[in-house]
Amino acid sequence: MKVVDQKRKIPYWGIAILVLAIFSLSVVYMNQEGEAVLTNSGTASNEKIGWGIKRNDNHEQPDLGKKNQTLLEQNGGIAMGNKEKKYIYLTFDEGYEAGYTPQILEALKQNEVKATFFITAHYINTEPELVKQMIEQGHIIGNHTVNHKSMPDLNKQEIESEVMKLHQVMQEKFQYEMKYLRPPKGEYSERTLQETQSLGYKTVMWSFAYQDWDEKNQPDKTKAKQKILDNLHPGEIMLLHGNSKTNTDLLGEIIQEAKKMGYEFKSLDEFNE
């Protein structure tokens, strides 16, 4: 009696079709290091998410929202550091110059603190000397996109243009390679996180921010100082706006008080230490 082998081999053309099907749902990019990055941004959700946190005043890490935090981390982003280390990562959003950045830079220099400045194309074009000073003092320059548009409202090509045109300008004018990005308005989606990561960028959100951005309605200095100090916590990524007079006037005091409380200020480049 002849035994028939029931095993069926998949023909080579079948394997090829399967591979093509997988790649059809994905996009391959070359990141800044020249490495191929495979993403499935074509099928990712584009539901717009506004970053938010639930603060406390007992110096514990705030609630970032488990779902949003997980989504951010799955796509290489960060919002808060090690809960066991009293580190603070100071960041500034600089869409335009209001006349306070020279004082901010001086306070950082006097207190030996390195910060990250997220800037737009407008800022580079109007304040090249300040950008140069930031770099010379050892601060990090982050990408806040060309035109500060909400990223989920943009298609893939528009996102690449908003991010990489600014990247190219920094390379050409300052020989500087940016690698951190903060989404304008704190708005993002699963799709935009994947697409910015594919461009070689790490998305940086925050674990503390407050209403400091309105120049015409600046917070009271005493209340602002108390709020900032009450919310200090391990691994904090602090977001301040560079157009705030209150922040500028308080910066030196905040740094000194935080150090007295046992906190150390770290650069984003030291995030994993």
Which sequence ranges carry the predicted segments?
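Metal-dependent polysaccharide deacetylase catalytic core of the NodB/CE4 family, i.e.
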Residues: 85-88, 98-100, 109-239
